[in-house]
C-alpha cells in the first residue's frame, strides 16, 4: 500500500471523526489487498505503535467517542452539510482470542445508500502502546458466515498483538 509505512495517512478515520491521537503514532504498517471483480471495496490490516500506553488509550477513547456520536446521529455530516447515513448492526458470537472488551472497538455498519452503499466490518484492538486494525468493506454486505470468518481473522491478529 502506498505510504503504508508512513504516518501521512490516518489510522483512525471512522465516521470522519477528529482524532488528535494520530500525532502520537510513532510507527505504522498498513497493508491493503484488492482483487478485480471482487465485491470487497476495501480490505486492509494495520498495526500502529503509539508514543506511550497513555497515547494508545487516548486513541481508543477518541474512537469510542466518535463511534457513540456517529451512532446517536445515525451518521455524520460531510463538508457540504449532507448526512452520510450509518446503520449500525450488532456483532454477536465474538470468538475467544480477541482482546478484552475494554481494549477493543468492533464496528459493523451499513454506510450510505444507493450506488454509494457499502458495509464495513472494522475491528480495532489495543494492547499496551500497540493497536491493530482490520477493515473489511463490501459493496454487497456480509453473510453471517462471512462475519464469523473475519472475526476469526481478528482473533488471529489479537494473538499477534499480544506477542
Feature-to-residue mapping (PLM):
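A small/polar (G/S/T-enriched), proline-flanked helix-loop surface module common
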Residues: 1-119, 153
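Short, well-ordered beta-strand elements
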Residues: 43-46, 129-139
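Residue-level signal for secondary-structure boundary sites
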Residues: 53-55, 132, 142
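Glycine-rich loops and low-complexity Gly/Arg-rich segments
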Residues: 69-74, 131-134, 158-160
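Short, solvent-exposed coil/turn segments at beta-strand boundaries
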Residues: 99, 124-131
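Mobile, glycine-rich extracellular loop/lid and propeptide segments
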Residues: 118-127, 137, 147
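Surface-exposed amphipathic alpha-helical segments
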Residues: 135-163
Amino acid at each position: 500500500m502506498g505510504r503504508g509505512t508512513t504516518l501521512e495517512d490516518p489510522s483512525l478515520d471512522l465516521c470522519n471523526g477528529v482524532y488528535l491521537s494520530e500525532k502520537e503514532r510513532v510507527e505504522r504498517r498498513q497493508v491493503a489487498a484488492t482483487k478485480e471483480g471482487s465485491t470487497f471495496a476495501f480490505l486492509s490490516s494495520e498495526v500502529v505503535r503509539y508514543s506511550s500506553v497513555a497515547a494508545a488509550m487516548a486513541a481508543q477513547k477518541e474512537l469510542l467517542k466518535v463511534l457513540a456520536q456517529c451512532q446517536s446521529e445515525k451518521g455524520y455530516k460531510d463538508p457540504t452539510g449532507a448526512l452520510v447515513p450509518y446503520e449500525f448492526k450488532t456483532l454477536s458470537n465474538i470468538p475467544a482470542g480477541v482482546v478484552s472488551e475494554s481494549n477493543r472497538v468492533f464496528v459493523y455498519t451499513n454506510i450510505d445508500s444507493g450506488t454509494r452503499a457499502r458495509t464495513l466490518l472494522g475491528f480495532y484492538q489495543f494492547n499496551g502502546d500497540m493497536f491493530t486494525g482490520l477493515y473489511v468493506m463490501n459493496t454487497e454486505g456480509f453473510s453471517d458466515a462471512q462475519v464469523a470468518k473475519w472475526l476469526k481473522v481478528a482473533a488471529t491478529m489479537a494473538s499477534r498483538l499480544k506477542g
